[in-house]
Amino acid sequence: MGLPGDGVEVRGELTLVRPAGEADVDLLVAWHADPEVARYWDDETFTPDEMRERLGRDGVDSFIVEAEGEPVGYLQAWRSGVAGGLDGFLIPGARGRGLMPDAARALAVFLLAGGWPEVTVDPYTWNDRAIRAWQKAGFVEHSRHPPDADHSAEWVLMRASLRTL
């Protein structure tokens, strides 16, 4: 079974998760420049060259989430040793329609079926919308943590396995 980052697309009931590529760079730069997206990503913004670098990182696969043939969001799957996790967002106009839980569940099931022992997410505790979306996708809260080198605020470790999905 190929990884989605190897060109494989993953379908949910409402969404298609496909690898992000060069053709998506300007779209991803624009999305990250939107204050309603950036605030959930520690206000990170990127130039096109910086985005290309991000898309080419080792250990991280980047994806575009599509609904009804239109790009509506971003997911990334990262792997470090036996640990692996997802991060993602939807553009503001796509929120509240169940698209992120659908896309995240589809990608998590694919990764778990491909050998990942579990998939984690780490939303900030203040991001109730994300926590609810991850719960709807099948992720279960495991623990809460203070800010650290990777998190600017208190965050929640949530886990999913084939048993919870």
Could you say what each language-model-derived stretch is?
Residues L27, E50-E53, D102, A106:
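Alpha-helical elements of Rossmann-like donor-binding domains used by nucleotide-donor carbohydrate transfer enzymes
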Residues Q135-H145:
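Conserved acetyl-CoA-binding loop of GNAT-fold acetyltransferases
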Residues V121-I131, P147-S152:
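Conserved beta-strand-loop-alpha-helix junction that forms the acyl-donor binding cleft
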Residues W31:
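Conserved catalytic core of Hanks-type protein kinase domains
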Residues G2-D6, E154-L165:
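Terminal substrate-recognition subdomain of acyl/acetyltransferases
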Residues T15, P19-A23, D34, A38-R95, ...:
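Acetyl-CoA-dependent GNAT
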Residues L86-G88, V119-P123:
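Conserved hydrophobic beta-strand within the GNAT/NAT acetyltransferase core sheet
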Residues G96-A113, D128-K136:
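Conserved acetyl-CoA-binding loop-helix of GNAT-fold acetyltransferases
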